[in-house]
Structure formats: C-alpha cells, structure tokens
C-alpha cells in the first residue's frame, strides 16, 4: 500500500485527537495523486474531503454514516483492508504495525511546528527520497511533498 500523511516540522500528526492543520490545495493534490483510483481513509479523514468537495448529503452528515463516496473508501480498518498499491491517507493512527506492507510513503510537510501528541512512527531509515517538491497551499505558504520508496 501507499501511505499518504501530513506532518509538521517534528513529524507531528495530531494534537488532542485533532488534526494539526488542513489545506484545500493539498486535498486537491492528494485526489489527483490517486489518479481517480480508490483512496482509503477512515471516517474522520473523509469528512474533510467530502465537506470541501461539497458532495456530502446533509442526511449523511447528520447521521454520521459516511461510508463510501466514489473514489473515497472509508473504513476504520482501512490499513488492514487496503491492497497492494492502494493509497491510504493516514491522520490519526500508527503506521509502524503495517511497515511490511508499505510500498511507498508520500509525506506532506506543513513547514511549521504545531503542538503534537501523535507522531509519524514509521522509520524511513534505508528508504530512498525519490522526489521532493514545494508548492503553495491555500492556508500554508509552502507545503513540501516528499516521496519515499524502499
């Protein structure tokens, strides 16, 4: 599977059960990165994608039953269910237990330090930084994309 994750300068991912930040341009780039294929995530992450794209029906939002919506595949066990080559957007959980299944990591760096209590925990020692690029976001002057391969 391919892991997509956003981190701050200290590899922080969340603080007090909340994402550190989000960015509209970044979400669009993540959707483009998947090339229209299935993108795995949990319901917490799915909310930010659906609300921004404006395609979450009110009754689904109110009921909390998000399920699947086209390209986005929401499931609390998404890291267990994702198949080879399938992208997974991770915000709120450890990836280390799935290290043996990870084929690629796409790290988006916020270029800021935020408070954090959950950190990226998959060591990239021995991995190759295949590509690095910077781009302006909607709420961040610079977001850095790093692609790692084993």
Where on the chain are the PLM-derived regions?
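Enzymes that bind and transform nitrogen-containing heteroaromatic metabolites
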Residues: 1-150
